[in-house]
Amino acid sequence: MTLFSSISSISSPMTSSKSSIASFGSGTSMGSNSIACGGGCGGGSGSILGLGLGLGLDLTGGSRSSGACGSNRGSGNRGHGHGHGSMGGGNGSCCGI
């Protein structure tokens, strides 16, 4: 189980979901696929800020690799996925990974 998050470059918040976030949590690579998924599923208005925060905080905190996607699909926490984004069925049904 690799808990390692590396955010390469996050564009300005509120831009298109094209920021390069390379994060690896629990052996699942979260590259451009995750950005497209998280932007559509979690950030309703496509806010990279929420997506970046959710991915970064969750990965650093534990094995919740898809915080932005998992947490937002449930409670709409806009990237504050501290405990909701569990990398299981939630992530799968949301991102389709």
From Swiss-Prot:
Residues 84-97 have a biased composition (Gly residues). PANTHER family: HSSA/B-LIKE PROTEIN 1-RELATED-RELATED, HSSA_B-LIKE PROTEIN 1-RELATED. It comes from the Eukaryota. Belongs to the hssA/B family. Residues 63-75 have a biased composition (Low complexity). GO terms for biological process: sorocarp development. Residues 1-25, 63-97 are annotated as: Disordered. This is HssA/B-like protein 35.
